[in-house]
């Protein structure tokens, strides 16, 4: 696979309505009383793809994800609904010097959404939580360097949203209306002439089925 020079990226973990039939060859796990599964790179590559402008490649236990030149962003979406508490755990490496990670929790009617945004800059990193475009919380104490794997945990427990990087809570907030029947995914967005790319591994997803 041809890999371009990567200068910037946006990663979006998204919640959308709808569900598709998907069978994974995965290991059953339990975390904080919630059943879950370890998702291999091969099974992750079977998730719903949003566009033909998306390039993926299984590299051992890792999945390489890249958008094509001229793309306006691509998404890899878990094709089943998630209701109630969940834990989305994985290791992520950006292949860029700057970028953003966004986690979106949207209800199944689409009338509101929460966005947890991590902005990766050369000088500092900023975490923000948005609700329907309004900033509700901001924090500045975390590290997210390119070409380094970080363990990320995105968790919803009751009305609480939490985001951890390498075991440290980066930002958290309380939802007024927790989203139901959401589907998690990963979206990357670069510049038109400089496509975004990431590598992801050790994915685990926990929720009450």
Enumerate the language-model features and the residues they cover:
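Hydrophobic membrane-insertion alpha-helices, especially the h-region
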Residues: 6-20
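Extracellular carbohydrate-recognition regions
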Residues: 22-53
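Secretory/extracellular carbohydrate-interaction modules
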Residues: 22-28, 67-127
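Extracellular glycan-recognition surfaces and repeat-rich motifs
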Residues: 42-63, 67, 72, 112-113
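Beta-strand-rich interaction surfaces with strong enrichment in secreted/lumenal proteins
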Residues: 74-80, 103, 138-144, 174, ...
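Short tryptophan-centered beta-strand motifs in secreted/extracellular beta-sheet-rich domains
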Residues: 90, 148-165
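Short, aromatic/His-centered strand-loop micro-motif at the edge of beta-sheets
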Residues: 131-151
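Flexible glycan-contacting loops in extracellular carbohydrate-active proteins
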Residues: 173-202
């Amino acid at each position: 696979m041809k890999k371009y020079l990567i200068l910037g990226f946006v990663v979006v973990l998204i919640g959308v309505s709808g569900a598709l039939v998907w069978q994974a060859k995965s290991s059953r796990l339990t975390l904080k009383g919630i059943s879950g599964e370890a998702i291999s790179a091969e099974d992750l590559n079977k998730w719903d793809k949003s566009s033909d402008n998306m390039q993926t490649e299984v590299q051992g236990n890792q999945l390489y994800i890249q958008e094509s030149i001229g793309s306006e962003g691509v998404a890899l979406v878990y094709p089943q609904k998630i209701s109630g508490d969940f834990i989305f755990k994985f290791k992520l490496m950006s292949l860029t010097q700057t970028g953003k990670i966004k986690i979106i929790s949207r209800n199944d009617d689409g009338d509101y959404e929460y966005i947890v945004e991590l902005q990766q800059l050369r000088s500092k990193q900023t975490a923000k939580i948005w609700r329907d475009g309004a900033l509700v919380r901001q924090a500045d104490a975390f590290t997210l360097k390119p070409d380094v794997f970080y363990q990320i945990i995105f968790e919803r427990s009751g009305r609480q949203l939490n985001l951890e990087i390498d075991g440290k809570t980066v930002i958290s907030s309380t939802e007024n209306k927790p989203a139901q029947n959401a589907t998690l995914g990963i979206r990357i967005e670069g510049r038109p002439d400089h496509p975004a790319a990431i590598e992801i591994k050790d994915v685990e997803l926990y929720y009450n089925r």
